A protein has these predicted regions:
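Basic, glycine/lysine-rich polyanion-binding surfaces/domains
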Residues: 1-184
């Protein structure tokens, strides 16, 4: 049976056409794909991407491990920065692309593609054996939304004023509706 995101009931109430995507019941469309594409290009759209995988890496060797595991430098990031990167196998073939967030000096959150979450987790866990890190799959503990389109900042700023001060590939923690959120 497919998993349901924290927003599943909202999708149903709003009349979404739901499909199984990577083991998750996800909205394919609401009224029409054309109007939704128009919204993203000219206005703003909110996407439920809670099906994405979230893998926490923690421990003294976090930065060293991720520098070894990913194609981009993780150790160059300050807390509050993120990097889009690729995770490769021993022959240089791509396992997955992901975003790595430096949430503390010795802590990182990797957001991986939904269809690859278990495969990625297993690979990361296997590769971590020589490093002083802990690897945890937190995918079932996170809800994730993406806000996209030219009016995204305007919409988000109406709820969280600090959003406008974020730089490219930076994030911060905010409280929205009494819930702690991370904004990128």
């Amino acid at each position: 049976m497919a998993k349901k995101t924290p927003l599943y009931e909202e999708h149903v109430a709003l009349g979404a056409k739901l499909v199984d995507f990577a083991g998750w019941m996800m909205p394919l469309q609401y009224e029409s794909i054309v109007s939704e594409v128009e919204a993203v290009r000219k206005n703003v759209a909110v996407f439920d991407v809670s099906h994405m995988g979230e893998i926490l890496i923690s421990g003294a060797d976090t930065a060293m491990f991720l520098d070894w595991l990913l194609t981009n430098s993780f150790s160059a990031l300050n807390v509050g920065q993120a990097v889009y990167s690729v995770m490769c196998n021993e022959k240089g073939g791509i396992i997955d692309d992901l975003i790595a967030y430096r949430i503390a000096d010795n802590e990182a959150l990797l957001v991986v593609n939904a269809a690859n979450t278990q495969k990625d987790f297993d690979w990361i866990k296997l590769q971590s054996k020589e490093f002083n890190v802990q690897v945890d799959d937190l995918s079932d503990e996170y809800g994730l939304i993406a806000v996209q389109g030219p009016k995204s900042e305007s919409l988000l700023s109406s709820v969280v004023q600090e959003v406008s001060s974020l730089k490219y590939y930076h994030f911060a923690e905010f409280t929205i509706f009494n819930k702690k959120m991370h904004g990128e």
